[in-house]
């Protein structure tokens, strides 16, 4: 059995910070930042929590996939900025989505987080342990 991506979703905080907003703090300018990072602007959390943002992205992905939350067997959240140590962000997402049939856990692997979580989900699917995974 092989898995495939059936829906995607995203969420970004409303607070946008451009490079020029940072030039005094970092004693640099927009051009220097762009040349080295490619970043023009970033979305910064103010009142949002990691689990809040994960839930908003998940809701969009679930809607895009055209499935119900009850169909989800596995939730994996990759983050280095959890709301709390316990419960895991994935457990908070599971509760908020009412995805009562899902096993869930977080992984903490920074930049390679999505591909690592995707590979774990794919392994669970290939082994026949789950049918539908939510990777955040």
Features from the language model and the residues they span:
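Conserved catalytic cysteine-centered active-site region
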Residues: 34-36, 40-52, 79-133
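Short glycine-rich or small-residue beta-strand-to-loop segments that form or flank ligand, phosphate
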Residues: 73-79
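Contiguous hydrophobic segments
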Residues: 15, 59, 67, 122-127, ...
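Conserved "HGTGT" condensation-loop signature of ketosynthase/thiolase-family condensing enzymes
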Residues: 1-73, 97
């Amino acid at each position: 059995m092989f898995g495939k991506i059936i829906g995607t979703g995203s969420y970004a905080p409303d607070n946008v910070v451009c490079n020029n907003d940072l030039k005094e703090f970092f004693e640099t300018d927009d051009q220097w930042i762009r040349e080295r990072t490619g970043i023009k602007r970033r979305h910064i959390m103010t009142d949002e929590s990691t689990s809040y943002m994960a839930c908003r992205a998940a809701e969009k992905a679930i809607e895009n996939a055209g499935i119900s939350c009850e169909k989800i067997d596995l939730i994996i959240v990759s983050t280095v900025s959890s709301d709390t140590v316990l419960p895991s962000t994935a457990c908070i997402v599971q509760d908020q989505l009412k995805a009562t049939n899902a096993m869930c856990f977080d992984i903490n692997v920074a930049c390679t987080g999505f591909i690592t979580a995707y590979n774990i989900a794919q392994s669970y699917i290939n082994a026949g342990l789950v049918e539908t995974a939510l990777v955040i």
